[in-house]
Amino acid sequence: MTKSLDDAALATLFTEARTHNGWTDKPIGDETLMALYDLTKMGPTSANCSPARFVFVRSQEAKEKLKPALSSGNLEKTMAAPVTVIAAIDSEFYEKLPELFPHADARSWFTSSPAVAEETAFRNATLQAGYLILAARALGLDTGAMSGFDKGKVDAAFFAGTTWKSNFLINLGYGDPSKLFGRLPRLGFEDACVLA
């Protein structure tokens, strides 16, 4: 890959993209959610481990299950979003490695070291959720990621008896630009980077 994206694509993904707090009532169809995952899954992970799992919360019943776990500042915008993604982590992601990394016994790397498995799962699932945000923008969707929620309540409501645990939430839909805040500053290169 030697060709750079044009300015319009970079604007869609980064420079003009915003974290949204308000939403239009335009729905998101199943085919769009499937296309979103199909892009997300192509992002690289360590040993192709792919530990992220995603729950697309969209029915009223599922929203009501999620509601008690939300912080007050995230309640209204989350209930209004067409979809809220629970970006989760499968702690036993390594059970899929014979399929995902068949040329080596990668499963044993993680079953022999729970600490390495936990660290790998968290790092790579978070990375995959970042890919999902960029994939959503590439498909014309807006996002609003949040960590203001009660993980224990989400896990009890959605993941009881499973190896999945919540990481963070991402509201998904078509943003209402009138609800945007002014863009906040970002650190300059000299504050965040070192050339070594």
Curated annotation (Swiss-Prot):
Class in the EC hierarchy, top level: oxidoreductase
Annotated EC: 1.-.-.-
Superkingdom per UniProt: Bacteria
Record Pfam families: Nitroreductase
Keywords, alphabetical: Flavoprotein, FMN, NAD, NADP, Oxidoreductase
Cofactor(s) listed in the protein's UniProt record: FMN
Family of the protein in this entry: Belongs to the nitroreductase family. HadB/RutE subfamily.
Name under which the protein is recorded: Putative NADH dehydrogenase/NAD(P)H nitroreductase Atu2496
Organism from which the protein derives: Agrobacterium fabrum (strain C58 / ATCC 33970)
